[in-house]
Structures are given as C-alpha cells and as structure tokens.
UniProtKB/Swiss-Prot annotation:
Pfam families: ThrE_2 (PF12821). GO terms for biological process: succinate transport. This is Probable succinate transporter subunit YjjB. The keyword Transmembrane helix applies. The chain crosses the membrane at residues 10-30, 55-75, 87-107, 129-149.
Length: 157
C-alpha cells in the first residue's frame, strides 16, 4: 500500500506542477507547440525534487539538482525542436519557487514592524528568508550550469 500511495502522490504532484508551468509559459508567450513540453518539463522537475526530498535530501539541494535536470533536458529539447532553451526551462522551474517561505518571511517582517521586535518573529523571519533565498539561488545556479557546461567553447584542460 505504501508504494502505491507514494506513486499516486508523485503523479498528483507532477500533474499539479504542470498547470502553473503551462500558465507561466503562456504569460511568457511561449509558442503553442512548446506548451506541452513546458508542462512535461515542469512536472519532471517538481517530481524529481519530490523524489529527492523523500529520499532524504533537504529542499535546497533537491531544488538545485532538479534545476540541473530541468536545464539539461531543456538544452537537449532545444536542439531537437530548434528553439531557445529558455522557452522550456524558465516556465518549468517556476512551480519550484519558494512561495510559502517567502510569504512567511514577509508576514514576519510586517508583524515585527507592526507589533515591535520579538525574538520568535525574528527567528521566523530570518529562517524563512534564508530558506527562500537559498532555494531561489539553487534554482538560478542549477538552471544556468548546464548551459555553461554544454556550450563551452574552450577546452576544459
């Protein structure tokens, strides 16, 4: 029963991650023929992050590795479909952005400014701010590294 419920949760997570990936791809004017690939790549990225987190990785490292995967697949698909990799990758990583951590940090900052300094609120603010910043950094670095590796002009040695 455990593996079936895990696979169901994984499929649900991937399906729900594909929806905002397509939505943001439409906002970014991605061609209609590429929308399904943006959805698939968003689902792959979010699903791989969920698998890594359930395997014991923390969310920052899981996000970094998932962004590496999304960037690598996006570069390969861009070669196949003769499109820029950002068409596939940028909309695909948006479902992995840390909305809850950033929101909690913002609310903590507002509460500190409204009610005054509180050690609990400051700890909540700093921990959530650092978590959100780390995840955004992991997304941006993980998305850019495959391009640096695969489009390198000079020899590595």
């Amino acid at each position: 029963m455990g593996i079936i419920s895990y696979l169901f949760d994984l499929a649900q997570d991937m399906a729900l991650a594909a929806i905002p990936a397509v939505g943001f791809a439409m906002v970014f004017n991605v061609p209609q023929r590429a929308l399904r690939w943006c959805a698939l790549l968003g689902a792959i990225g979010h699903g791989s992050r969920m698998v890594m987190m359930s395997a014991g990785f923390n969310i920052e490292w899981a996000t970094f590795l998932a962004a590496l995967l999304v960037g690598s697949i996006g570069i390969q698909w861009s070669r196949w479909y003769l499109a820029h990799p950002k068409i596939f990758t940028v909309a695909a990583v948006i479902p992995m952005f840390p909305g809850i951590s950033a929101y909690t940090a913002m609310i903590s900052a507002v509460k500190i400014s409204h009610f005054g300094y509180s050690e609990e609120m400051m700890i909540m603010l700093l921990s959530n701010f650092l978590k959100a910043s780390s995840i955004v950094g992991a997304l941006s670095i993980g998305l850019s590294i495959p391009g640096l590796w695969l489009y390198r002009k000079r020899p590595r040695v």
